[in-house]
């Protein structure tokens, strides 16, 4: 299999790194606005008198349904129009809707505002992944995508810290306003400084030559769906990422209420600890993509991308059970830190292989399709499942019902690991068929 040559000379390495830094900053803002709700769930529950099921709906399904479904048509637009403009407009929308969450006086108003956040954030990652794939060649792409994905732990870290402090000092309403406004400023930076790279400019010479001859528009959505579904490795990868996210989002939304209820932590302390834990998770988020690039390069075997995702997912499980079943806080906090490191290792490899499995004009849609599976199964159902399970277990376990609901959620990681290993079986064959198609098409 041929590798990409050195990256293009259209943009300097310094500018490409600058572009990655700006996209990373946008993703940090994305996850601040997305994750802030978790730390604010308890004060919202107390003021608006909501059940755990309703909180799970706010933290998951209401956001994810619109985030995931609109991500696909928005990604299709990004494959046809300016990706930087799609990203900036989306950022303005989700930032404004985050600020409006603070004006909600009842469950319905807050639900609608969270839906608005989901609508805006649907336009974040698909164009960003596509841009990164054109700025960086294939042998550096997983590392670049992992750096972008560092927006998750760093955004969550800031969201938890600001949320814990803001809930105690400002109240949950003003906290939403505080975190919503910076995204509008970042959107302005994207519009004025981020350039739209030529599609395919960081591919191998053969692929670039074919791309230069091929000026046809991007394929229809159904063609992209069919193309990806025919690749067994992507089917397994998509299900694995979705199940992994089911646990990740289910736990992520409910970790703060768990620490408050089962360990009687004050909200400012919870915010500080979860901020530290989220920041530590950056090690795994970067490390997963970096290890994938290095091991696949050393062994000339790109199955390592999915093997890394599968191994890290499997190893997480005992640490998750330790975090939720042990009573000593000095056991719980280190266990959650290990989970945070391992939990991000699937991101870079998963998105890098998704980009590698499709042709140039399918990249934003391919990213959106993986995000659809990840977010419908993960973000949509994970927090909602934990909320429902907690309410159902409450008559038997009372304040500790959330702890056992989280343990039930963790079991999905065992299933996710199986799909990663199954996906690795056909990965080389699927990658080869895509590369042949790109080099021969004209």
Can you describe what each PLM-predicted range is?
Residues 5-12, 201-238, 262:
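Juxtamembrane intracellular "pre-TM" segments in multi-pass secondary transporters
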